[in-house]
Regions:
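N-terminal secretory/targeting leader peptides
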Residues: 1-38, 54-191
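Acidic, metal/ion-coordinating pockets
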Residues: 45
Length: 191
């Protein structure tokens, strides 16, 4: 929101925020992208970014890149290991979007909407038993003491989306835009 209204020129965000604005980005479903190399090929060898950006034009956003954040997405659980889909049926998973609900409905698993700031407490109180994320997230947010297991589902790459204000970007003088674009490419190579 801050990028859209011009308070920030560049920001990182989760995929859910942009998926609501771009049907193509929303169509990236779990298990479609099998590795980081696969996502690299999609971003570097296709018009995927250009097509997503065409869908974001009315929202004054440009999707610059995906910043990879760790291992592939899996399932973090409290109290119960998960070895098969049937093991999930007794659990309540933390969700954030309608897409999450659709996935859990297909698995016949219950979901509970919980704000990220409340996940640790929701795990401690039994409001939720699990969430989907890469394993590093439990460490980054101090959930290690309330989670017991990680199941490597390899649902897809874990990434934050790097966006910029379209107005700001298009107003950059050509020499500054060239430097900015080179920085984005350099960041992609380093990531």
């Amino acid at each position: 929101d801050q990028v859209e209204i011009g308070l920030l020129e560049v920001n990182e965000t989760g995929g859910d925020a942009l998926a609501r604005l771009s049907p193509l980005l929303d169509a990236m479903r779990p298990f479609e992208i099998e590795s980081y190399e696969h996502l690299d090929r999609l971003l570097e060898r296709t018009d995927f970014l250009a097509e997503v950006n065409a869908e974001l034009a009315d929202d004054d956003l440009v999707l610059l890149d995906f910043a990879y954040t760790g291992e592939m997405v899996g399932l973090l659980t409290r109290g119960k290991p998960v070895h098969r889909i049937g093991d999930l049926r007794s659990l309540r998973l933390r969700i954030i979007s309608a897409g999450d609900l659709s996935l859990l409905a297909a698995w016949k698993v219950r979901g509970v909407r919980v704000a990220w700031e409340e996940v640790a407490q929701a795990l401690q109180t039994g409001m939720v038993d699990a969430y989907l994320n890469p394993p590093i997230v439990a460490v980054m947010f101090g959930h290690g003491n309330v989670l017991d297991y990680f199941t490597d589902l390899r649902m897809g790459p874990s990434a934050r989306l790097i966006v910029t204000s379209r107005r700001w970007y298009e107003r950059l003088p050509p020499q500054f835009r060239a430097v900015f674009d080179a920085g984005v490419l350099e960041a992609r190579a380093a990531n």
